[in-house]
């Protein structure tokens, strides 16, 4: 497994990502949910390095293997809360924003 982005070569981009992470860490979103979102975004992006890293973070916070294994199909799985579903929909929409825009209903659900 190889790291896709060399943080030292792309320090300007990484600083922006870290700043965003720092900002979000101060929000009302709890760490286990952040970890779940990071893992889902890594699935979408196809980053094996990130999936390995975030799966370890999830397991360390008590995430179950069952939820990890079906996260790719979270819409059909009964294991996620309403809050998690709203956050997952938002994360997917933002990650795939080049395919259109974040739908209003996704934005409204995540605001709640």
Identify the function of each model-found stretch:
Residues 37, 41-54:
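Short, thiol/selenol-centered motifs that function as redox-active sites or metal-ligating centers
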Residues 14, 51-70:
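Iron-sulfur (Fe-S) cluster-binding segments and ferredoxin-like electron-carrier domains
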Residues 1-36, 55-59:
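Acidic, glycine/proline-rich low-complexity segments that act as flexible tails and inter-domain linkers
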Residues 31-35, 49, 66:
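Short, solvent-exposed positions on alpha-helices
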Residues 70-111:
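Mid-chain, well-packed structural core segment of small domains
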Residues 11-16, 46-50, 97-104:
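Short acidic alpha-helix initiation/capping motifs at coil-to-helix transition points
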Residues 16, 35-36, 67-70, 90-93:
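Residue-level recognition of specific faces of alpha-helices
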């Amino acid at each position: 497994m190889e790291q896709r982005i060399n943080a030292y070569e792309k320090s300007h981009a990484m600083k922006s990502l870290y700043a965003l992470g720092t900002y979000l860490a101060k929000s009302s979103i709890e760490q286990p949910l952040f970890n779940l979102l990071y893992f889902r975004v890594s699935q979408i992006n196809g980053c094996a390095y990130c999936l390995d890293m975030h799966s370890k973070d999830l397991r360390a916070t008590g995430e179950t293997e069952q939820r990890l294994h079906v996260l790719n199909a979270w819409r059909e799985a009964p294991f996620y809360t309403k809050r998690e579903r709203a956050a997952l929909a938002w994360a997917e929409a933002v990650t795939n924003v080049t395919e259109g825009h974040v739908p209003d209903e996704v934005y409204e659900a995540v605001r709640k």
